[in-house]
Regions:
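Conserved acetyl-CoA-binding loop-helix of GNAT-fold acetyltransferases
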Residues: 85-104, 256, 262-279, 294-302
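A structural microfeature
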Residues: 58, 147-148, 238, 309
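Active-site rim helix/loop that mediates acceptor-substrate recognition in acyltransferases
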Residues: 23-52, 61, 196-231
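Acyl-donor-binding surface of acyltransferase catalytic domains
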Residues: 1, 88-173, 314
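Conserved active-site tyrosine of GNAT-family acetyltransferases
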Residues: 134, 138, 300, 305
């Protein structure tokens, strides 16, 4: 008779010196952990492990974009994939619920969970098993799938089209200048996160302000990089936010006003944003778009962006 598996010990890291313990399981963002801890984007008390003896059988961690901020995102959730089911899933759920109860205030909204996954994860049995095991645990805790996304990369040496002259680009003059354009772009958006903001009861204007204040206001690269696209007569067409986040040069946001969609302006605007970053001598530019946002995905492909990875995001509608 096979003995029942022992109950795991579930606890947070005692300090940054236990990072090696945390890294006994692996994920594609392991190389960022040390710097995240040093800069306050991650804290030992947000980093939890499930242990059987000295064997790590599960781990998770939350992340924040600002030193001293509350947890904004659950971006690490790993299990020992050599374990059989249901043992693997039971450990994962116990780890998730124990850590959540300890880290997040009772009744507060749970931060979104996201994971980077191979682009062919559905065709690769091993990758599919890893992905589906995480999804099952999250669903058991009450989460639902929000969206699957394409992660994209432009690489130095890839040609960027010259400015066609169809549009005139100017710098953003301030918060209101950009928010006033973001709001109409959000109306009718194909972006799942944008749709979720509107479904929560926020107006398009409120959702735009929230996006600006929580993300764009904290970007450390110059606002002089940001561009508003106009027709030669001065009518705004759209905008692009080239920037650098804590890890990579990125196209943080791009949009075309509803009345100007269908004219191919997205190609001109994306090219301008890419040119701004390429002029800084970067070796890559990262971007992402929803799997279902076919027009945006096709625009990135036309400009030579490669789909190197995918991601999925899950959310909890209740605390």
């Amino acid at each position: 008779m096979t003995p029942a598996p022992s109950e795991p010990t579930i606890r947070p890291l005692s300090g940054a010196d236990e990072l090696g313990l945390f890294c006994r399981l692996s994920y594609v963002l392991d190389h960022e952990l040390a710097d995240d801890l040093a800069t306050g984007r991650r804290r030992p008390e947000w980093m939890w492990v499930a242990l059987r003896g000295d064997r790590v059988v599960g781990r998770l961690s939350w992340w924040t974009g600002q030193d001293g901020g509350a947890p904004q995102f659950l971006d690490f959730f790993d299990l020992d994939d050599t374990l059989p089911e249901p043992d693997r899933g039971e450990i994962g759920l116990r780890l998730l619920e124990t850590a959540t109860a300890a880290v997040l205030p009772a009744g507060s909204a749970r931060p979104e969970y996201g994971r980077f996954i191979p682009p062919d994860w559905r065709e690769d049995p091993a990758a599919r098993d890893v992905v589906e095991a995480r999804i099952r645990v999250m669903e058991a805790s009450g989460a639902r799938m929000l969206v699957e996304r394409l992660r994209l990369e432009w690489r130095a040496g890839t040609a960027v089209p010259e400015d066609t002259g169809r549009l005139v680009f100017r710098q953003v003059t301030g918060r209101e200048d950009l928010v006033a354009l973001m709001a109409p772009v959000l109306e009718g958006t194909l972006d799942a996160h944008g749709q979720a903001h509107l479904a929560s009861g926020l107006s398009a204007r409120e959702a735009a302000e929230k996006h600006y204040d929580e993300e764009f206001a904290h970007l450390k690269t110059p606002q002089e990089w940001w561009r508003i696209a106009q027709l030669p007569g001065g009518e705004p067409v759209g905008f692009v936010i080239p920037a650098r986040n804590n890890y990579h040069p990125v196209i943080a946001y791009i949009g075309v006003l509803p009345e100007h969609r269908g004219n191919g302006y997205i190609d001109d605007i994306l090219a301008e944003g890419t040119r701004v970053l390429a002029a800084q001598g970067v070796d890559r530019v990262r971007a992402a778009t929803d799997l279902g946002n076919v027009p945006m995905a096709e625009a990135f492909a036309r400009l030579g962006y490669v789909n190197f990875e995918r991601a999925f995001d899950m959310v909890w509608d209740q605390p």
